[in-house]
Structure formats: C-alpha cells, structure tokens
Amino acid sequence: MNSIQLIIDIILILWILILTVLYFKRRQLNVDIVKNKKIIRAKRYIVFYVISEYKVKGDDLERVIRNSLKDLLGSVWLNIANPKVVTYREDTQEGIISTNRVGYKAVLASLPFAKEINNNKILIVPRRTTGSLKKAKKLIGLK
C-alpha cells in the first residue's frame, strides 16, 4: 500500500513540475511579444482629397477629422489613432493624414462622417494608404 502511494505521489509531483515549467515558458513568451513596440509606433499615411464648393483650410480639416473619429469610436480610439494632417495643399485640396498602424482603419472608417466645415458641406475621399511619407508626398505631387 505504501509503495503504491509513493508512486502516485511521485507522479503527481512530476505532473505539477511539468505544468509549472510550461506555465513559466508561456508567460515568458507573452512578455516578449508585449515588449515589441514597433507594431504600435509604425506610421501609416492616408492620402486623400476633399470635394467641396469652397476652399478648406488644413487646421479646420484636422479638427473635423478628429471630431468625426471621436464621434464614431470615442476618445479612446482618438488617442490610439492620433490622426494629424501632415500636409495639405489648398490649391488642389489634397493632403496627407498621419496615423499609426493600429488606428489607420479607424481613421478610414471615420472619414465619411466628416461632413461639414463652417457650414459648408464637404466629402473627404481617401485615395491610398502608404507606409512612407515620401511615397505619400509623391502621390499628391510634392517633391
């Protein structure tokens, strides 16, 4: 009877040891994934143009884009995406919005909700999303 109990105890101890080792390996793996901040910092640039009867200023455009994102998904996604109008050409009404890799789809989804600037109706149409500012500037005809 004692020998059977001893064997069961040894098997249980080995089982607990194996589970503990697997748990710590998994925990260590998750920590390595979280430390990778490149995913969050990677930039995306959205090239867009504005359809409007009147000329639109870049500052007003950024304010409207930020408000539409806040109305659609809330202030948490506004802080995550942090959209900024990097370049805006008032003559052709084309521009570039800078955001990060996590929030660029949220910014794209909120662009149709930006409908009005200073009681003038507008429509913001995204043309392309790129990973480099140089390529985005080339698409709107700068440099």
UniProtKB/Swiss-Prot annotation:
Subunit structure: Consists of a catalytic RNA component and at least 4-5 protein subunits.
Gene Ontology terms: cellular component: cytoplasm; ribonuclease P complex
Protein's name in the database: Ribonuclease P protein component 2
Taxonomy, superkingdom: Archaea
Localization terms from the record: Cytoplasm
Record-listed E.C. numbers: 3.1.26.5
Main location: cytoplasm
Gene Ontology biological-process entries: tRNA 5'-leader removal
Gene3D superfamilies per the UniProt record, alphabetical: Ribonuclease P, Pop5 subunit
Enzyme class: hydrolase
Disulfide bonds: none
Keyword annotations: Cytoplasm, Endonuclease, Hydrolase, Nuclease, tRNA processing
Catalytic activity reported: Endonucleolytic cleavage of RNA, removing 5'-extranucleotides from tRNA precursor
GO molecular-function term, one example from the UniProt record: ribonuclease P activity
Name of encoding gene: rnp2
Protein's UniProt keywords contain Repeat: no
Role, per record: Part of ribonuclease P, a protein complex that generates mature tRNA molecules by cleaving their 5'-ends.
SUPFAM superfamilies listed in its UniProt record: Rnp2-like
Entry's family note: Belongs to the eukaryotic/archaeal RNase P protein component 2 family.
